[in-house]
């Protein structure tokens, strides 16, 4: 092409097909009963997708739910992991598409909740060199064919123990996330091993700043050498170590910001000042307010003029346009005088109170991060906030730019065993990353946090040849064995990994920690060895069902469904003589068995607990529960009283025969005396019954 500068776009396709059984929108592969067609971008500047948006940001929604394959801009449905890119459904089948944009000229786009945002000029050769691969093959060779294309075309092809990450059973291995220091790393390694896991992920304050990635002295006082020794200790015990990265987010304390701000900090746009500024001015006259008065995503309200950063509260409502109530020399920069006509730029920021990067600075930061990995031997990374790299003006191209540069700078040894995850992907980034994963399990209970989001995304992963992941789960001092096994069963059912976030203090405080860690290791062994059959996996994918395993010998476990009946007994105020008990109905689905149960005093104290089974057998439990305490019975000759954090506090003898239930329907009348109770006081009563037992053997045994 001799006049590449005159060509704005090269569009590959759309290539329409009649195939519609499985459409991998991100991977760019559509599959029918026997035959698959695919498209692959062969370099980073060739984007999977179509220029639906001038910003090169691909639509993010579940197009399969929407039902309208023509509307690429619907209202968001919360399915943020979905990206309509290289493949999409059509009314008659599907289409494959890719494109490349000429970026020699500055453009104005919409992004980051800004109606006007400068996309800087970027010289990557323009559309010259854009290329794709189109392939067709039997369905069962689809993934293998992509792997061959990667190797033939020199695309990223990361490995795990020498095997392509996309086909490695270890690609979605579970891992422990915890805070540790040079002093406490041995304990963190021991906990990882106790849980039967092989990956330990640092999640304290790893870095003093984001940008230069200087290690935090409070946790790594010996800097690079200190972290390297932590990695070596873990490696010696078969544990790989990784950490968290907020991608191109730059903290205000970073040398890219202070004391002299880097000119490559991302900008919303620029104007000029219309009058001289002395060192005391708190109002700044500007020629145009266009890039300064967009407040939807304006978290730091910072402008750059020369080497000075200035924060402002607002823009005047009328001419002459002024930035109001300015704080001079923000973030430790130097207050200076400025002449009329000097360029003033609004810096682009993020809700995490950080600045972002232009493309050249993204590349430099990526190399710094790769240098850290090469020097320390870290082998796992999570690129959190990759969407921040759209600050480059490159859209999804920018999202791939940081991990692509980072990966290319890594040593050959690291590339031989590497796990790369992120909370999002793009068509090209698919080649680099190992798996999708995401965090923020903080706002709800173990079973409620992002539940629908976790499970709905599994179909997206499967149709795009991605290892399944369920995201992060947070273990607290009050997490129960039942909660953990609920999650572990979903992990096994979906063949999906997860991250367990657990600080050392919570693990130490939780009285069930030993059992929890053992169960994690046992379930993970069985999952990674593909020991569960398809029928068991299907059952475990049911969100409303619970399952448990019990080790019965070397390499073998009893697996069964657990039928959990959860009831609430509330304090009642009635006429004298009127019953105050609650009646609960349940069904024992299989054999005669001893019922197991838990009684939790939610927000009150109780005593004189009684259970009347089937209107003839009354069992008095001579125990008093304080608010938060839990009475557990697991079928033995004792009932156990625990604190809210699982610390055993008392045991009482019982006769197991009293709790024997035949197969079929039953009723239980629950009663107690409330102490120190409010009007809304309640007691939680859960009965647990075991279904048919199946023996599961470790495939490696």
Provide a role label for each language-model segment:
Residues 139-160, 193-202, 226-269, 339-341, ...:
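Glycine-rich, aromatic-flanked loop segments that form ligand/cofactor-binding clefts
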Residues 169-170, 174-271, 347-370, 374-400:
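Aromatic-lined carbohydrate-binding/catalytic grooves of carbohydrate-active enzymes
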Residues 227-251, 264-271, 426, 490, ...:
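Carbohydrate-binding surfaces of carbohydrate-active enzymes
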Residues 247, 251-335:
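Autoprocessing Asn-cyclization modules and mimics
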Residues 252, 256-271, 347-364, 409-510:
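Glycan-recognition surfaces
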Residues 328-336, 340, 586-701:
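Intrinsically disordered, low-complexity segments enriched in serine, threonine, and glycine
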């Amino acid at each position: 092409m001799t006049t590449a500068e005159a060509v704005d776009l090269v569009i590959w396709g759309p290539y329409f097909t009649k195939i519609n059984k499985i459409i991998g929108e991100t991977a760019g592969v559509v599959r029918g009963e026997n035959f698959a067609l695919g498209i692959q971008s062969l370099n980073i500047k060739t984007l999977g997708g179509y220029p639906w948006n001038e910003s090169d940001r691909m639509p993010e929604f579940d197009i399969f739910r929407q039902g309208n394959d023509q509307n690429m801009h619907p209202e968001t449905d919360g399915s943020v992991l979905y990206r309509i890119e290289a493949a999409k459904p059509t009314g008659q089948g599907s289409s494959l598409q890719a494109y490349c944009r000429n970026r020699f000229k500055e453009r104005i786009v919409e992004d980051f909740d800004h109606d006007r945002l400068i996309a800087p000029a970027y010289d990557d050769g323009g559309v010259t060199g854009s290329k794709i691969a189109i392939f067709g093959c039997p369905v069962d060779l689809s993934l293998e064919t992509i792997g061959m294309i990667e190797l033939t075309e020199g695309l990223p092809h990361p490995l795990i123990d020498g095997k392509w990450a996309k086909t490695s059973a270890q690609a979605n291995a579970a891992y422990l996330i915890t805070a540790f220091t040079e002093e406490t790393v041995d304990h963190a390694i021991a906990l990882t091993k106790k849980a039967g896991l092989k990956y330990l992920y640092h999640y304290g304050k790893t870095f003093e700043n984001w940008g230069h990635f200087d290690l935090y002295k409070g946790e790594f006082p010996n800097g690079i050498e200190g972290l390297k020794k932590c990695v070596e200790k873990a490696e010696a015990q078969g544990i790989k170590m990784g950490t968290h990265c907020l991608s191109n987010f730059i903290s205000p304390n970073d040398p890219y910001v202070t004391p002299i701000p880097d000119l490559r900090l991302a900008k919303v746009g620029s104007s000029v000042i219309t009058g001289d500024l002395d060192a005391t001015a708190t109002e700044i006259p500007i020629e145009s307010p266009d890039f300064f008065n967009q407040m939807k995503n304006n978290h730091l309200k910072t402008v750059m003029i020369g080497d000075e950063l200035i924060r402002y509260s607002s823009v005047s409502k009328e001419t002459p346009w002024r930035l109001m109530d300015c704080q001079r020399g923000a973030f430790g920069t130097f207050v200076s005088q400025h002449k009329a006509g000097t360029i003033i730029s609004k810096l682009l920021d993020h809700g995490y109170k950080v600045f972002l990067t232009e493309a050249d600075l993204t590349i430099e930061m990526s190399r710094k991060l790769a240098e850290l990995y090469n020097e320390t031997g870290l082998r796992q990374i999570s690129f959190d906030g990759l969407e921040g790299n759209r600050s480059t003006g490159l859209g999804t191209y920018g999202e791939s730019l940081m991990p692509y540069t980072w990966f290319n700078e890594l040593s050959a040894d690291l590339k031989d065993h590497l796990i790369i995850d992120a909370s999002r992907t793009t068509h090209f980034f698919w080649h680099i990353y190992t798996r999708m994963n995401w965090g923020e399990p903080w706002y709800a209970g173990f079973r409620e946090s992002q539940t629908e989001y976790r499970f709905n995304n599994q179909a997206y992963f499967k149709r795009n040849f991605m290892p399944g992941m369920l995201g992060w789960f947070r273990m607290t001092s009050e997490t129960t064995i039942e909660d953990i096994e609920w999650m572990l069963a979903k992990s096994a059912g979906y063949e999906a990994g997860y991250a367990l976030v657990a600080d050392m203090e919570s693990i130490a405080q939780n009285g069930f920690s030993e059992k929890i860690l053992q169960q994690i290791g046992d379930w993970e062994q069985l999952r990674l060895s593909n020991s569960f059959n398809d029928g068991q996996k299907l059952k475990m994918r049911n969100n409303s069902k619970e399952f448990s395993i019990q080790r019965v010998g070397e390499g073998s476990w009893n697996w069964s469904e657990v039928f959990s009946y959860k009831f609430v007994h509330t304090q009642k105020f009635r006429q004298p003589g009127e019953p105050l008990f609650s009646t609960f109905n349940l069904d024992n689905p299989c054999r005669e068995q001893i019922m197991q149960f838990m009684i939790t005093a939610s927000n009150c104290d109780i005593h004189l607990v009684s259970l009347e089974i089937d209107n003839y057998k009354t069992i008095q439990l001579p125990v008093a529960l304080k608010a938060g305490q839990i009475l557990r019975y697991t079928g033995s000759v004792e009932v156990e009283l625990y604190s809210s954090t699982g610390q055993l506090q008392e045991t009482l003898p019982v006769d197991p025969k009293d709790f024997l239930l035949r197969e079929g329907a039953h009723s239980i009348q629950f009663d107690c005396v409330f102490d120190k109770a409010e009007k809304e006081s309640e007691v939680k009563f859960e009965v647990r019954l075991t279904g048919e037992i199946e023996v599961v053997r470790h495939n490696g045994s």
